[in-house]
């Protein structure tokens, strides 16, 4: 949430109790962008002040996500690097009469905080003797200390209009072993107490935070005032101190960015995990097939302001389309197949047709796709009694088969329920792509795969996770807002052999359908593809 500019470099700080989402990506792009602009280096700092919510899994995934976005950091730091200094600073504050041990319950402390329009009530322990406070603070950092039995609070101003100034908690007891320091510590600093001081210790010049940290800024400054007093530099308060600056966070329509709600989605198995392709997490977007360049392009387009805004998911998807159009390999896949038999094509004969990998980039070359008598086409591409403006396959009309021949439909076969099981057509032998006969005007072009030279595949389609534009602002239980149609599975699709060999990380365009990527579940025997985004924004049309 907070990001640090240091002399000749930038500091990016992250909580290590969850996975990064696209909102974090906006901050990361700013940090590394500033470092690049001023020929500096970006360092990372992990806020590991709450061992009960942290583990190395989160650290490893955060580092992977930052690398995937295309950034390289300088050094990696942890708030735990400064636990000794923070402890000494807290002891100094107690000795100066600026901090005390409070043995009230969390509920009692919250009740005594008051409201924004009424002052708080002083704790009965506020004027506890300094020596007693020091002894109890030492007791907090023992294995016998009971979580919630006491906290260290700063003695500031219980009548201050800023609620964060009303004797904030500096330390609490946590008996969970720390993933770096083990059982050395049993009392841990609060984030508000640790991050400003860590900035000061590192020589950070500016702390760039999201807008919810605006009311925290006076407290950030106050603790640094105390720290400069401890260091004997209180006479020059404005020298060599970090300053906090805020910018707006990234919010997207039809999803949530709240870490609590994202945890809830995962814990209640409402999604398949943190990398569910419907999630706004970077690992989810990567699995779905979003490119890091498209995410950075989107973030650059919305900019940084002082006003919170709700950004349309369609803008992000437009950036994804724009980027993938330049890099995705074009392949053929049939999601809802129906058999097409070319009745006048020689039995047992095949041809290798040349297919351009990407018309946007000639250097990507070509591949071959096998053509034969028996093909699969999309069921929706055939209509027996078609309206005038239906330019796909219908009896008596010609269509072009992509990269192959012009064919004319001659009829179809149905089962006892009237369901079409086979379509028949005749091909024009001199209309092959590249031949002179292929130049005649035919309005419809269909994609296809050879029935004997394709691979059966599973295709997963995703849509908006929530039905409402701004679920975070809706007062209803967010379970009621989930989109029941956000996931569809198509287990009986067919893809050309060239597509079946593609791996996660390789961008594909299923021609006339959309952009896709092989899923982590994909195998050579049963390829699995995730739909990244359609060629057009169908959601907007559905919800007009």
Language model region names:
Residues 96-262, 320, 329, 336-338, ...:
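Active-site cores that bind ATP or allylic diphosphates and position pyrophosphate for catalysis
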Residues 1-122, 212-242, 251, 256-258, ...:
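N-terminal Rossmann-like or analogous alpha/beta NTP/dinucleotide-binding catalytic cores
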Residues 47-48, 205-208, 280:
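Short beta-alpha connecting loops at secondary-structure transitions
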């Amino acid at each position: 949430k907070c990001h640090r500019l240091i002399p000749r470099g930038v500091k990016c700080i992250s909580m290590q109790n969850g996975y990064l989402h696209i909102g974090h990506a906006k901050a990361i792009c700013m940090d590394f962008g500033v470092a690049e602009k001023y020929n500096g280096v970006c360092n990372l700092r992990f806020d590991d002040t709450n061992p009960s919510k942290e583990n190395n899994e989160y650290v490893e995934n955060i580092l992977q996500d930052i690398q995937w976005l295309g950034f390289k950091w300088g050094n990696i730091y942890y708030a735990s690097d400064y636990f000794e200094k923070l402890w000494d600073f807290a002891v100094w504050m107690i000795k100066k009469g600026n901090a005390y041990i409070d043995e009230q319950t969390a509920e009692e402390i919250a009740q005594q905080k008051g409201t924004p329009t009424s002052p708080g009530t002083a704790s009965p322990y506020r004027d506890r003797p300094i020596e007693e406070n020091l002894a109890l603070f030492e007791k907090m950092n023992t294995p016998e200390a009971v979580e919630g039995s006491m906290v260290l609070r700063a003695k500031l101003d219980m009548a201050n209009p800023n609620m964060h100034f009303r004797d904030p908690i500096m330390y609490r007891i946590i008996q969970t072993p720390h993933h770096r320091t083990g059982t050395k510590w049993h009392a841990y600093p609060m984030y508000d107490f640790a991050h400003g001081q860590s900035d000061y210790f590192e020589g950070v010049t500016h702390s760039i935070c999201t807008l919810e940290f605006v009311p925290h800024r006076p407290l950030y400054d106050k603790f640094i005032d105390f720290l400069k007093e401890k260091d004997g530099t209180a006479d020059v308060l404005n020298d060599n101190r970090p300053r906090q600056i805020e910018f707006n966070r990234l919010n997207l329509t039809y999803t949530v960015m709240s870490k609590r709600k994202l945890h809830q989605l995962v814990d209640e198995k409402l999604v398949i995990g943190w990398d569910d392709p419907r999630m706004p997490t970077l690992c989810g977007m990567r699995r779905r097939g979003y490119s890091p360049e498209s995410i950075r392009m989107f973030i650059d387009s919305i900019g940084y302001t002082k006003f919170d805004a709700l950004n349309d998911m369609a803008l992000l998807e437009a950036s994804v389309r724009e980027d993938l159009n330049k890099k995705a390999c074009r392949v053929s896949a049939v999601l809802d197949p129906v058999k097409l038999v070319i009745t006048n094509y020689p039995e047992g004969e095949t041809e290798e047709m040349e297919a351009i990998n990407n018309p946007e980039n000639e250097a990507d070359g070509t591949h071959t796709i096998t053509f034969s008598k028996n093909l699969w086409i999309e069921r929706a591409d055939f209509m027996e009694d078609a309206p005038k403006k239906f330019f796909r396959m219908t009896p008596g009309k010609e269509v072009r088969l992509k990269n192959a021949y012009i064919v004319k439909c001659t009829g179809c076969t149905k089962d006892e329920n009237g369901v079409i099981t086979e379509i028949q057509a005749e091909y024009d032998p001199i209309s092959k792509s590249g031949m002179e006969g292929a130049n005649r005007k035919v309005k419809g072009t269909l994609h296809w795969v050879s029935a004997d030279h394709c691979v059966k595949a599973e295709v997963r389609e995703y849509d908006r996770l929530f039905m409402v534009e701004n679920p975070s602002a809706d007062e209803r239980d967010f379970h009621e807002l989930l989109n029941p149609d956000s996931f569809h599975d198509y287990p009986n699709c067919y893809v050309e052999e060239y597509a079946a060999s593609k791996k996660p990380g390789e961008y594909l365009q299923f021609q006339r359908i959309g952009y896709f990527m092989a899923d982590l579940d994909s195998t050579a025997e049963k390829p699995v593809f995730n739909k990244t985004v359609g060629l057009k924004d169908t959601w907007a049309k559905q919800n007009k």
